[in-house]
Amino acid sequence: GNRLIAQQVTLSQSATIQSLSYYVATTGGQLRLGIYNNSGSAPGALMAQTAAFTPVAGWNTQAVTTPLSLSPGTYWLVFLPQNNTLAGRLGQSGIGRHYSYTFGAMPSTYSTSYTGDTFHFSFYATLSLP
């Protein structure tokens, strides 16, 4: 909990983000999901986020508060758990970033003082094509 956790993803064509889905293995507290643009090799500016919600075990899909058109490129799917009890399904590949952040609305820009790591969670965006 109290960590803003990001994983890098690539969008191959223009699309509008509708929702974000995250797999919860162990429930606990609330969760917020978001997407940031890319800045160098790290998350940059917040593009969209969900409202805070109480997740259930398994897949949790939440609409973003404002659907957003995205161009092809690199983005970061980001999640913010309220506490350390909540656990996702973790893999040991991929590019990840994380840092301490108090639960609430996601910051407008991701901190440049992050820890880099190798991981990915079961986490995806649902998109609509133009």
Give the location of each predicted region.
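Generic detector of ordered secondary-structure context
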Residues: 1, 12-13, 25, 69
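Short beta-strands within extracellular/lumenal beta-sheet-rich domains
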Residues: 1-11, 59-62
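A carbohydrate-recognition surface predominantly in extracellular/luminal proteins
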Residues: 7, 20-22
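Extended extracellular/luminal ectodomain segments enriched in beta-structured repeat modules
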Residues: 11-19, 28
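Aromatic- and Gly/Pro-enriched, solvent-exposed loop/edge beta-strand patches characteristic
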Residues: 24-115
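Cross-kingdom TIR/SEFIR domain
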Residues: 117-119
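Low-complexity, Pro/Thr/Ser/Gly/Ala-rich linker/spacer regions in secreted
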Residues: 127-130
